[in-house]
Amino acid sequence: MKKGFRIIKFKKDKPVFQIKDVTKSYDGRPILKKISMNLYPGECVGLLGPNGSGKSTLYSTIIGEIYADAGKIILKGKEIQDQPVHLRSKAGIGYLSQQRSVFDMSVHDNILGICQFTIKNVEDQIKLTERLLDEFNLQHLRNIEASNLSGGEVRRLMLARLLINKPSVVLLDEPMAALDPIVVQDIQKYILKLQNYGCAILITDHQFNNLFDIVDRAYVLGEQSIIAQGTPSEILKSSKAIELYFGPSYRT
């Protein structure tokens, strides 16, 4: 764990989010086989696996873009696997996709516009907008059109907007993809700011080094199932995880 990254400590008493035996197939071909995991409030968890391992399918199943063939998805004690995307969002699931999902307006209005949909009091809308601009280092970009932002700046804006709906769980689909190493370190810092709000964080990635400095635990997907789980150091000792990434001939 890099010094200065951890913001709060999570309490591992009761999971805020659970996946139980989630299974998904396409045209009879299994993609996910009985996937199970728990997330706790304020915890940052990685979902690792090479391309084609099922990460994107699991991500889409959790947020409601597709439905599982079997299994349960539980948020704050309530089953949500049959709910569509908008109801899962309303229940407390926030998500950030790999697409550049911003409005064609200024950075300030990108945040304020969502605040206006979710907060009745105008003064509170303005206060939250300014707070998020400050916390995600966007004040100097407030009047810039979002379409003119760099990749890292867009990620910061998207992360800031996630917090407006007060999610209990945040899913981030490869948020550090195609970013320079120095920008990756910056985004890692802002991802962990979500913990200030008590969010449980699940981050997908296919690269170990993008996540291991910031996650508390990780799950590794391979062969349509979870082949390893644990702390970063435990994952690095897993023969199945090492073989998946480096091949059967690899030796530590």
Q: Where in this protein do the model-derived segments appear?
A:
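Conserved ABC transporter NBD signature motif
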Residues: 71-79, 91
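Conserved ABC ATPase signature
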Residues: 145-149, 153
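The feature captures the beta-strand-to-loop junction immediately N-terminal to the Walker
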Residues: 48-50
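Catalytic Walker B motif of ABC-type/P-loop ATPase nucleotide-binding domains
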Residues: 170-174
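Conserved ABC ATPase "signature" region
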Residues: 123-141, 189-192
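Helix-to-loop junction immediately C-terminal to a conserved catalytic motif
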Residues: 63
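ABC-type ATPase nucleotide-binding domains, specifically the catalytic core motifs of the NBD
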Residues: 27, 109-124, 135, 248-249
